[in-house]
């Protein structure tokens, strides 16, 4: 014979190793596994480990030329999910050597590239990843991080304020720039290109960049504050994306933007490197994330996409609001907000954090709260997100009955009132409405905003509960 036993394999003999002690250098994954009826959980967990590492469906001759023990993924623990029938969390350990250094792309191709179509599984969701320090250190991470951004902007002790310019499609570049100017002049720190504003026939990117730069410089001169507009550099090719970032740098503006999931991790990491080398901040939008993360039992949880972004690089990322029109459970959201901002995050299952994560001083990312929020939400947002965040009010600025600049004034007054109240020791959760009401006596712009949005609520049952 040829010296090996041919035939289809029983995965659990090789890949289910409950006695395995994880190494500090292993990448650890927590999968939510729903096996097909009749498939035992150990076999399903082992299949995940095999298919996302060294395994193939049958024994092959070339297995003899390598050391399976050194390179295989191992399913080292399986636990049933409370309250779910036939659903398990399978923990898998991957040896570090399976991954190319500094490549989020390769990490995802390996871990989630193939296994999600596997027939023995009804559904599969990647809930969390533990990135070991040895692998973290191969990534540059965010171009600048939270502290450097505050120093560049000279803004401390409060969240930053933003606004997405609407209508997102159809404005000419000059009118777009005018809307940017009014918002920044009224008191916002940032305005934002919508994620799907790239370079369309009604407004080419170069014209937009030029008029937005003009708006930034004019509003800076008039307010004495540093201003920015997230110029969306996302493009159809990496070369074109970098060309747009170069033009932004030539204009001297502080920040550009990228859609990291539609643009892809390879493009994103290149852009992040360019931004660090050239002193540009990088704002990240997560367009397409719900395609990947919305289903409770299949796909990838956003906390994994957030960790991946911190590795690939970005200074801001959208992270749900807890209070607005887009869903996001409070504890779960705060869990991945901490994963974005903090250096060391303890395992905490109540917040969806399956592993302790040590980022070994990789810079942090500012979470961006955006979507359906307005002045009445300000106390809750200040309380929930704290100072290190960007609060973005699109309609909540531009929908003001008196126009953009008064809308911006209303938001800035509301924010400053909340920060002052908090610093004076007041309870934002309990006295929030009172704080806003008091402030509106001194600000007609805020009073008008309070009138418009007094009854708006977006209330649905959350989808993604643990």
From Swiss-Prot:
Q: Which reaction does it catalyse?
A: 2 (2R)-3-phosphoglycerate + 2 H(+) = D-ribulose 1,5-bisphosphate + CO2 + H2O; D-ribulose 1,5-bisphosphate + O2 = 2-phosphoglycolate + (2R)-3-phosphoglycerate + 2 H(+)
Report the enzyme's class at the first EC level.
Answer: lyase
The residues the record assigns to binding substrate are 114, 164, 168, 286, 318, 370
Q: Which InterPro entries match?
A: RuBisCO (IPR033966), RuBisCo_large_chain_AS (IPR020878), RuBisCO_lsu_C (IPR000685), RuBisCO_lsu_C_sf (IPR036376), RuBisCO_lsu_fd_N (IPR017443), RuBisCO_lsu_N_sf (IPR036422), RuBisCO_lsuI (IPR020888)
Give Gene Ontology CC terms: chloroplast
Matching PROSITE patterns: RUBISCO_LARGE (PS00157)
UniProt EC number:
4.1.1.39
SUPFAM superfamilies given in the database record: RuBisCo, C-terminal domain, RuBisCO, large subunit, small (N-terminal) domain
Sample GO molecular function, one term: magnesium ion binding
Can the keyword Plastid be found in this entry's annotation?
yes
Write out the PTM section of this UniProt entry. Answer: The disulfide bond which can form in the large chain dimeric partners within the hexadecamer appears to be associated with oxidative stress and protein turnover.
What's the domain of life for this entry? Answer: Eukaryota
Q: What is its main location?
A: plastid
Instruction: Set out the biological process GO terms recorded for this chain's protein.
Output: photorespiration; reductive pentose-phosphate cycle
Localization annotation: Plastid, Chloroplast
Q: What Pfam family does this protein match (any one)?
A: RuBisCO_large_N
> How is this protein organized at the quaternary level?
Heterohexadecamer of 8 large chains and 8 small chains; disulfide-linked. The disulfide link is formed within the large subunit homodimers.
**Reported function:** RuBisCO catalyzes two reactions: the carboxylation of D-ribulose 1,5-bisphosphate, the primary event in carbon dioxide fixation, as well as the oxidative fragmentation of the pentose substrate in the photorespiration process. Both reactions occur simultaneously and in competition at the same active site.
Query: Which PANTHER family does its entry note?
Result: RIBULOSE BISPHOSPHATE CARBOXYLASE, RIBULOSE BISPHOSPHATE CARBOXYLASE LARGE CHAIN
Could you identify this protein by its name?
Answer: Ribulose bisphosphate carboxylase large chain
Read off the lineage from the record.
Eukaryota, Viridiplantae, Streptophyta, Embryophyta, Tracheophyta
């Amino acid at each position: 014979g040829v010296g090996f036993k041919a035939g289809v394999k029983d995965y659990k003999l090789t890949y289910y190793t409950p006695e395995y002690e994880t190494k500090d250098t292993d990448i650890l994954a927590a999968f939510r596994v729903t096996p097909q009826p009749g498939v035992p959980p150990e076999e399903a967990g082992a299949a995940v480990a095999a298919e996302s590492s060294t395994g193939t469906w049958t024994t092959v001759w070339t297995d003899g030329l390598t050391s399976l023990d050194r390179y295989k993924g191992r399913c080292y623990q399986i636990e049933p999910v409370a309250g779910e029938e036939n659903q398990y969390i399978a923990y898998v350990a991957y040896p570090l050597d399976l991954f190319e250094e500094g490549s989020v792309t390769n990490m995802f191709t390996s871990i989630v590239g193939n296994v999600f179509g596997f027939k023995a599984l009804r559904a599969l969701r990647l809930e969390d990843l533990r990135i070991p320090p040895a692998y973290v250190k191969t990534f540059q991470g965010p171009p600048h991080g939270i502290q450097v951004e505050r120093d560049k902007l000279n803004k401390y002790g409060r969240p930053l304020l933003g606004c997405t310019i609407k209508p997102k499609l159809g404005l000419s570049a000059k009118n777009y720039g005018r809307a940017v100017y009014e918002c920044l002049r009224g008191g916002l720190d940032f305005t934002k290109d919508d994620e799907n504003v790239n370079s369309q026939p009604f407004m080419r990117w170069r014209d937009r960049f030029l008029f937005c730069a003009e708006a930034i410089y004019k509003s800076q001169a008039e307010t004495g504050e540093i201003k920015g507009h997230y110029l969306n550099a996302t493009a159809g090719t990496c070369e074109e994306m970098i060309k747009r970032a170069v033009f932004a740098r030539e204009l001297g503006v502080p920040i550009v933007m990228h859609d990291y999931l539609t643009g892809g991790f390879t493009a994103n990491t290149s852009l992040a490197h360019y931004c660090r080398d050239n002193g540009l901040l990088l704002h990240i939008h997560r367009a397409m994330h719900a395609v990947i993360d919305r289903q409770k039992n299949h796909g990838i949880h956003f906390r994994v996409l957030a960790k991946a972004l911190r590795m690939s690089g970005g200074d801001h990322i959208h992270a749900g609001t807890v209070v607005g029109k887009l869903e996001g459970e409070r504890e779960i959201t705060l869990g991945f907000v901490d994963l974005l901002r903090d250096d060391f995050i303890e395992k905490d299952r109540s917040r969806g954090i399956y592993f302790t994560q040590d980022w070994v001083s990789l810079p942090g990312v500012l979470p961006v709260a955006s979507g359906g929020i307005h002045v009445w939400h300000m106390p809750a947002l200040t309380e929930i997100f704290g100072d290190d965040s960007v609060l973005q009010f699109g309609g909540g600025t531009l929908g003001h009955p008196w126009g953009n600049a008064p809308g911006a004034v209303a938001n800035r007054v509301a924010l400053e009132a909340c920060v002052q109240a908090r610093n004076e020791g007041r309870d934002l959760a309990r006295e929030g409405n009172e704080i806003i009401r008091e402030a509106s006596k001194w600000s007609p712009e805020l009073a008008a905003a309070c009138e418009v949005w007094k009854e708006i609520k977006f209330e649905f049952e959350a989808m993604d509960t643990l």
